């Protein structure tokens, strides 16, 4: 993509109303623009980031789940059946259609997916089942703030498991636990699973996945040993491997503030290993048994011909929230420092002297060759000053930046900058394509 053809309205100054780093940088880099309180339009750069996050999530979720797509607007009756229509409170946006039917703008999908299951699955032979979808949701936050970190409208991946008994349901929960560790690892994040409150979703087992960040609204208490753990590729059908992985990760104390047992924390975690930090929630797991299957009649016939209500779990990842969380973790004073898997473009090309014919020729050639290799490239071909172009590249966080200027070309080299480390190397013109290919993971 050439910068002259790309809609990218960057800002030089910090917006006065943006209080946290991610909100400021998402506005300045042209990722988003506010439409109303807690509601944002996503511009091309932001959409590219969302798409990259989605791609990682979908790739991993497809290993243990099946993708569906449910509507944003739901019939209020199923929420009345579950008992959550009144319990959910003012965060739920309630509306009437032209026929005076009560509808809601879905804040979550437990009721709707349970109804889909109830109407279409009859036999134990169809279990276990796991379904996920990615959809925009709405919760009428009383104080929307921090940009998309706590907005009213947000993009979310939610998955739902259906099992014949509690043992199988816990295995489904554990598979998702490991799946989430892999998802966040692929995004370059050190996620920490912590014991959590079940909130309005309900149930008796729950974990939040959080990343440590100064601006996090949650507070976690954990053993530093959890940060030393790593997750490797795993066979999701191997119960022993999956359960052992979960047992290892949960063997270290880690809790949210809501579920903290202070005495237990002090007793189990050595003083030098205690971590008490602000963190951002990026994922949440819930096991709630038959909380929804009973009122919504989600049952199957078992081997003995008896009707059994299925055991369920739900599992969420905030896609739009993740975009902000990643920025909170990966940024510096110049702008965003995207991990490669999330970056809107992997390579940026800056022509430092736009009216220099040799610079233009070399820039165009490198751009064409990188595009032919299938790499995502942003070529800043604008007739702007070099300083402005370089500042924009750092602001939007492109991982690898190729700088082409007349002085370096005289000596037959080009500068290649790695955004996260700020390291700049001089690469010969003939080797730049091969070098970029080797660098990109």
Positions of PLM-derived features:
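NTP/phosphate- and nucleic-acid-binding module
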Residues: 1-441
């Amino acid at each position: 993509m050439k910068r002259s053809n790309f809609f990218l309205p960057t800002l030089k100054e910090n917006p006065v109303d943006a209080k946290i780093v991610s909100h400021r940088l998402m506005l300045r880099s042209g990722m988003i623009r506010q439409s109303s309180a807690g509601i944002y339009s996503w511009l091309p750069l932001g959409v590219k980031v969302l798409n990259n996050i989605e791609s990682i999530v979908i790739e991993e979720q497809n290993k243990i789940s099946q993708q569906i797509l449910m509507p944003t607007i739901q019939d209020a009756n199923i929420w009345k059946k579950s008992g959550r229509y009144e319990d959910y409170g003012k965060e739920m946006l309630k509306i009437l259609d032209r026929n005076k039917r009560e509808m809601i703008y879905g804040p979550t999908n437990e009721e709707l997916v349970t109804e889909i299951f109830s109407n279409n699955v009859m036999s134990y032979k169809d279990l276990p089942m796991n379904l996920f979808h990615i959809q925009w949701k709405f919760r009428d936050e009383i104080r929307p703030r921090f940009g998309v970190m706590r907005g009213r409208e947000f993009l979310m991946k939610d998955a739902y498991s259906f099992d014949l008994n509690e043992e199988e349901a816990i295995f489904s929960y554990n598979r998702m636990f490991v799946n989430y560790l892999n998802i966040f690892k692929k995004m370059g994040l050190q996620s920490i699973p912590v014991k959590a409150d079940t909130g309005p979703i309900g149930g008796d087992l729950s974990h939040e996945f959080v990343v440590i960040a100064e601006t996090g609204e949650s507070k976690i208490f954990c053993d530093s040993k959890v940060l030393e753990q790593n997750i490797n590729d795993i066979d999701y059908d191997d119960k022993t491997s999956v359960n052992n992985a979960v047992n290892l990760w949960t063997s270290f104390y880690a809790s949210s503030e809501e579920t903290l047992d202070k005495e237990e924390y002090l007793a189990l975690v050595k003083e030098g290993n205690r971590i008490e930090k602000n963190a951002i929630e990026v994922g949440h797991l819930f096991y709630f048994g038959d909380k929804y299957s009973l009122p919504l009649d989600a049952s199957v016939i078992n081997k003995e011909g008896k009707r059994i209500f299925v055991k369920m779990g739900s599992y969420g990842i905030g896609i739009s929230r993740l975009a902000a969380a990643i920025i909170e973790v990966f940024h510096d004073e110049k702008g965003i420092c995207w991990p490669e898997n999330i970056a809107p473009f992997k390579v940026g090309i800056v022509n430092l002297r736009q009216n220099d014919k040799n610079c233009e020729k070399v820039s165009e050639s490198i751009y064409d060759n990188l595009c032919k290799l299938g790499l995502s490239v942003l070529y800043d071909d604008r007739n702007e000053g070099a300083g402005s172009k370089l500042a924009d590249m750092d602001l939007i966080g492109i991982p690898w930046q190729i700088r082409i200027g007349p002085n370096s070309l005289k000596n037959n080299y080009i500068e290649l900058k790695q955004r996260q480390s700020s390291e700049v190397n001089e690469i010969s013109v003939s080797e730049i394509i091969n070098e970029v290919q080797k660098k990109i993971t």
